[in-house]
Amino acid sequence: TGWTTVYRDEGQTVYLSDDGSVYVPPADPEPVTPPEPYVPTLAELQASKKQEISTACEQAIYSGVSVTLADGSTEHFALTEHDQLNLFGKQAQLTAGVNQLEYHSDGQPCRYYSAADMTTIITKAMWHVSYHTTYCNALNMWIVGCESAEEVQQIFYGADVPEQYQSEVLKAYLVKIAAMAGDDVKDAQTA
C-alpha cells in the first residue's frame, strides 16, 4: 500500500511511486554548435608544403635514370641513397684507373661495365640527383616567399618555378633541359 502515485506511464507499462514523486524527463540538451574547422597558419602550411615537396623530390630521385650505353642499349638505374653511394665508389674506382667495373641495372644481375659506360651512368645519375635537389631548393624558396595560403596551395612538384625564385644553377639546368628537348625534336624530325 502506498504505491498510489503514477510515477511514469510508458503505455503498456506503468510505474508507481510510494512517495508522491513523478518522473520528470531530462531537458533536451542544447544544440551543440560544431567547432570551427582548424585553419592552419601560413607558417604551418609552408612547413607542410615543404615536406610534401621534399617527399616528391626524394621519390623523383630514387626512381632513377635510364642510360643509353655505348652499344646502344638502354638500362635503368634506381638512385636510392644506397645506389648513390655505390656510384660514388665506382667513381673512385674510375679515378684509380679501373677499366671494367661491376655493377647492375634495376632487376638485373651484376655484370661488368666498361669505364666509358660507367662514366656515362655516373654522369647521368649525378646530373639527375643534382637537378632534382636544385629544383626542390627553388620550390622551397618559392614556398617561403608566399604571402597567402592560396599561393602555397598552388605549388606542386613539377610546377614551373617563377624566375625570381630560380637560382643561377636552376636556370642553367633549365637551359640544358630545353636544349635536350630541342635535340629530341630534331632527332624525331630527321627519323
Give the role of each language-model region.
Residues 2, 7-191:
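A preference for well-ordered globular domain cores
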